[in-house]
Amino acid sequence: MTYSRQIVLKNGNTALLRNAEPSDAGAVLENFSLTHAETDYLLTYPDESTFDAEREARFLQRKAESANEIEIIAVADGRVVATAGVDAVGTRDKLRHRAEFGVSVLRAYWGLGLGRALTEACIQCAKEAGYEQLELTVVAENERAIALYRKAGFVEFGRNPRGFRSRTSGYQEIIHMLLAL
């Protein structure tokens, strides 16, 4: 699956949204470390990453060759500033219609339209891959993300009041959302 689109950010600068390639592994890992240190709303902490550049390159190669999964990066100002992905929930017949979606954006680029553009890109890719349902999990306190997802058509289908346990703020409620494609 391939994706490439140039967008104009709200600050007037441009960003290229495209497939992550194996050669992007170092930049993607750096972006992961930065984004996951900037907010408590993401699933993992930077020190929990088990990937090195070689393993990340293999992961990105598998995504680049996949017909139904994708890893998209946003490149602006000469660096990777955001990532997003669509992943199959499972390969068994009863699960093949479902995909998961996630996005992370560097704090310096929040509010510029990257989250919206990457969400739209992932929805488009999920449709093209033949999925019938796109799902995500979001921390209930992440009101900006929830508003973005609702605007894109996602609806809440469940909550887990102790879904995440943050090192700094204790338990966090998570919301499960889905979009019928």
Task: List each model region and its residues.
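Helix-loop element at the rim of GNAT/NAT acetyltransferase active sites that forms part
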Residues: E30-D47
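Terminal substrate-recognition subdomain of acyl/acetyltransferases
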Residues: M1-N13, V103, N160, R167-L181
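Acetyl-CoA-dependent GNAT
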Residues: E48-A108, T119, A180-L181
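Conserved GNAT acetyl-CoA-binding A-motif
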Residues: T119, A126-T137
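A short beta-loop-alpha structural element at the N-terminal edge
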Residues: A15-A27
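Conserved catalytic-core motifs of GNAT/GCN5-like acyltransferases
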Residues: E135-V138, R150, V155-Q172
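Short glycine/proline-centered loop/turn elements that form peptide/ligand docking sites
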Residues: G115, T119, E141-A145, R162-T168
